[in-house]
Amino acid sequence: MNHIVPPSLLFDFQLSIPRCADPSPKTIGRLLSMPAGSQLFIPAAMNDLPRFADVSVAWNPDGLAVVISVKGKPMNPTGTSRDIKRSDVTLLWIDTRPAGNVHRATEYCHHFACLPVDEHQDSQPAVVVQPIAQQRTTRIDSSAKHIRTRTHLEKGGYDLEVWIPGTQLHGFREITEIGRIGFYCVVQDSNLGEQPLTLDDNFPTGYDPSMWVHLELTS
């Protein structure tokens, strides 16, 4: 069904995410233990856009946990950090000072490309710190080497776990008092297409933080 105005554009979404434990220190097995209630509602489903991935988000004062679960994929993920547009990848945008009426990214906004496999790193998962168009300034140089990732291949898909330490997010130190973050993501798949969180790329979701979803941090 074609919509003149996408239904999800008619709502101001504020979703709650639970508090989680720190990531596992082990080098095998699950990196993150995601609590009940961490799976996000995907507003894009209201717009008849593709739906093939679950997105789970949780937090604690030391960082942010994100898990992407892709289903219905006919082959293993592929990709390279040298050509993100042609890769299986999840694009994340995070704002540690969401205002709701600011249309240009501030120094509190961050953008990461998270690859389940990177052929230039022995097919291990990888994160690439990305610029945001028209961003006013940055206060912290996020370093991908401090972001922990783990991929679990499954029949017909994969799980990608990402732990972003608060040290890599400007303004995260005060996040407990603020109680919310701005968040947006797009899951890009070479077989299944693109699944945005709310709106397709006809809208400026890649650089306008007022279009991102607010995540309320619960204890």
Model-derived features with residue positions:
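Structural preference for beta-rich elements and adjacent junctions enriched in aromatics
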Residues: M1-S219
